[in-house]
Amino acid sequence: MQDRHHRCPDEAEIAAINARHLIDTPIRPADLLFVFGTREDVERRVDEACRLWREGCFRWAIVSGGVTPGSPLSECAVIKSAMVARGIPAEKILEEHRAMNTGENVIFSLPIIDAAIGLGNIGSVICLGNTWTARRYPMTLHRHWPEVEKMLVTIDSFKTPRALWHTDAEFSRRMIAEWDKIEPYKASGFIAEWPVGEARDR
């Protein structure tokens, strides 16, 4: 059976993904950087987190990610260790070590943030994760924490420019796989529309 995520998107779908999934947000200083864990492109994630820290873009960070194939250490432990080695103070980085998916990243992290800082003291969050997952990070956060302002920074190691993702077979497969999750996940209540008003603007 052919993987439906290997389909060749037409021009309309490419344009829709570029406009509605690969969202660019202005980045301004935020209260919290939310680092969504991974085993892939860890160094690039850490590079971006360190750049944001040096530029004064966040006061606190949380790294979320459990033990997944590839290491006996949690994704959180690996990423936080690298962030600290690059100069971000350990005491500024909260830890969540159980999450196995994006929903759990958020659900398991909120009580940790609340205990350490207080959710009411956070007004803005920068989401940091993979390019192909893109809008689903803030959509997941918006489902469980609608009150805060959300910004999005994404990274990847593909040599293909982001807007030309459809010209690289693996980049395209990942992008379409994530894009195909959006409507079913909204219908199931796993994520919420973000940016607010996006549905009206279609």
What is the role of each PLM region?
Residues 1-175:
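A structural signal for short, hydrophobic/glycine-enriched beta-strand patches
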Residues 161-202:
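A structured, mid-to-C-terminal "fold-capping" secondary-structure block
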